[in-house]
Swiss-Prot record:
This is Large ribosomal subunit protein bL33B. The lineage of its organism: Bacteria, Bacillati, Mycoplasmatota, Mycoplasmoidales, Mycoplasmoidaceae. Belongs to the bacterial ribosomal protein bL33 family. The keyword Lyase does not apply. The gene is rpmG 2. Keywords: Ribonucleoprotein, Ribosomal protein. It holds the Pfam family Ribosomal_L33. InterPro entries: Ribosomal_bL33 (IPR001705), Ribosomal_bL33_CS (IPR018264), Ribosomal_bL33_sf (IPR038584), Ribosomal_zn-bd (IPR011332). GO terms for cellular component: cytoplasm; ribonucleoprotein complex; ribosome. The keyword Cytoplasm does not apply. One of its GO terms (biological process) is translation. NCBIfam families: PRK00504.1, rpmG_bact.
């Protein structure tokens, strides 16, 4: 079963992306993605 997650920009805390991942995975997802509010690539972390 897959779990829906939301990725949040670390700088402006804007919720920019949604994705899915396995429920068996225990580590939080951290990706470098483009933020339209910051107008640059920033670190996006998984929200709870």
């Amino acid at each position: 079963m897959r779990k829906k997650i939301i990725l949040i920009c670390e700088h402006c805390l804007n919720r920019n992306y949604t994705t899915t991942r396995s429920k068996l995975e225990t580590t939080r997802l951290v990706l470098n993605k483009y933020c339209s509010s910051c107008n640059q690539k920033t670190v996006h972390k998984e929200s709870h």
